[in-house]
C-alpha cells in the first residue's frame, strides 16, 4: 500500500435494494495501467465514480495517493483527471474555449490556460479544429478533446471509464497511443473497459469484476495461464451443424466443447501438446460428416478467461456481455483461478478526521474566478444559440405589442385616470419576462447533468458553489440585458419613466432581483428532477397561472373576487405593482416591502437548498 496510487478496501455501494459494489479490494501501483474488466452493470463505473468523489460509498475505504475520497475529497480532486463513458465537453464552445475554460477552473492563470490549451490541441491533433464548436467534432475528436480536458494540470492519476466505447478502430488506436504515452510520463491510469483486447493491449494488471466484486486479478498472461493449456478452435462450414459438432467432439480433449464468438465456431480446452487432439477431432467430425473450414490450436485469450470465470462469452461486437447464469449469480469458475468469495459482514472502515479547508483570501479569489468562468460560459451559450436568443428577446416584445395594440383599448377603461396602458403594461411585462425565463435555468442545468458536464465540474478542484452561482449570475446578466432592450422598445411605442432616474434604476433592480430568486428555485428543481423535459413541464404548470393570475396585464380589481384574494399576495403581483410604482410614481411604493420580502425569503430558502442538493448528489 505504501507505493499504491489507488487503494480500495472492502468498498460497498448500494442503490436502494441493488448492491453495485459488494466489497471491492484493489491496489493500483503508481505509473501503471490497471484494467478493470467486466460486463455492463458489473460495477465498474460505480467504482470510478466513488474514486472520483462523485459518489460516497456506504462502507469500506478508498484512497488516492493516501487521501481519503470521502474525508479529503477536495484533496483527491487536486490529484485526478476523469474521462467518463461519454465525452463531457461543452458542445457550444469551441475546442480551444473548452480547454481554456477547464484550465481556468483548474486554477491556471488566463495566460497559462491559453498556453496549456494550445499544447494539448497540438498533442491531440486538434489544432486545425480548435476554433470550431465541439458539436461539429467526430466521435474520436470529442474523445480526444475530453481526454485533453483531463490533462490540463498533468494529474497524478487518471480514471478512464470505457474511453473507447463506440469509437471506430482508428480512433480507438489513437486513444491507446495516448494512454501509452501518459504512462511513460509517469501518470497512473485506472482503465475500465468492456473490450477484452483493450485490457490485453494496455493493462499491466487486470481485475475482472462481476456483480460488484472482483472475481479474479493478475497480469494478462497470468489470467490466461490459469485457463490452462491451449484452445482447440473449430470453424464449421455450416453454423446450423454446431450442435451436431458439439456432440461429435464430446469426450475429446480435457473439457466439453463450448460455443465460440461466432455461431459457426466451437472451442475446446486442449492439453499442452494438442497435435494428437487435432487428429482426433478431425476424425470425429469426418465420421459425423460435418464439414470444417478451419481447425487449429491457439493460446487462450482474455475472452476465454472471461468465459471460464463468468460462464458467458463476449458479445458479437467484441464487448463483454452480461455475465450471469440462470440463477443470476456469477458463472462457474475454474478451481485454479483465484476467485473472490462473498464478503463477510461489511463494516464501515475507520474514518480519519475530515480536513477542513479554511476560506483564505486566495481561496475566496479562486472561488470568485470559478463562478465568473462558469458565468461567461453560460452567457456564450445564450449568445450562440439563435433559437434561445430569439425566444428570450422576441417573445416578451411580442407580448408588449400584442397587449398594447390588441387588448389595450379594452383594458384601458379599468386603469386609473391619466395612466396609459403602455405605462401600466411594460413594468408588468418585465416581471412576466423574468418569470417565464426562470425555467431556462433548470433546462440548462438539466442538460449539463445529462451530458456529463456537471460530473466534470464536480470532479475538479473548483468551488462547489461555482456551478450554481455561475448559472444564476449569467441568468441575471441576461435578464438585465433583455429588460433594457424591452424598455427601449417601450420608449419607441410611448412608454416613459415618470419618477426619475433613481427610481427607474430601482425598478430594473427589483425586477432583476425577482428573476434571480426564481432562478435559484429552478436550480433546485433541476437538481431534483434532473430532466430538462420535467423541469420545463414544472415551469409551465407553476409559472403560467402565477403570471396570468396577477396584475401583470390587468388590474386585479377586474378579476373575480375569489381570484383577487390570491392575486393580492402573489409575489408576481407584489413585484409588478412595486415595479410599476417605481416607474411612474415618485416615492416609496406601498407594495415594495412585500416584494422585497418575497425576494429575500426565496433566496434565503432556495440558495441553501440548491447548494445542499448539489452536494447531496454524491
Residue map of PLM features:
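Membrane-interfacial helix-loop-helix junctions in multi-pass membrane proteins
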Residues: 412, 498, 547-602
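ABC transporter nucleotide-binding domains
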Residues: 3-210, 216, 458-459, 464-473, ...
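ABC transporter nucleotide-binding domain
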Residues: 176-271
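Aromatic- and glycine-rich beta-strand/loop motifs that create alpha-glucan
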Residues: 4, 355-395
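Junction motif at the cytosolic side of a transmembrane helix
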Residues: 337, 342, 346-351, 583-586, ...
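Alpha-helical transmembrane segments and their short interhelical loops
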Residues: 464-539, 544, 589-611
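ABC-family P-loop ATPase nucleotide-binding domain
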Residues: 1-12, 312-368
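Hydrophobic alpha-helical transmembrane segments of multi-pass membrane transport/permease proteins
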Residues: 384-410, 422-437, 544-546, 601
